[in-house]
Amino acid sequence: MKVLASVKCICRNCKIIKRKRVVRVICSSDARHKQRQG
């Protein structure tokens, strides 16, 4: 899980979602693409 100021989709399987006012990126193909804004 990377904590970044601006989250971006890395591949086409990445999805941007909001959970409890936190913007996250989840990826079904590569777990290393997981990100959180903060």
UniProtKB/Swiss-Prot annotation:
InterPro entries: Ribosomal_bL36, Ribosomal_bL36_sp. It comes from the Bacteria. GO terms for molecular function: structural constituent of ribosome. The keyword tRNA processing does not apply. Pfam families: Ribosomal_L36. GO terms for biological process: translation. One of its GO terms (cellular component) is ribosome. Keywords: Ribonucleoprotein, Ribosomal protein. PANTHER family: 50S RIBOSOMAL PROTEIN L36, CHLOROPLASTIC, LARGE RIBOSOMAL SUBUNIT PROTEIN BL36C. Belongs to the bacterial ribosomal protein bL36 family. NCBIfam families: rpmJ_bact. HAMAP family: Ribosomal_bL36. This is Large ribosomal subunit protein bL36.
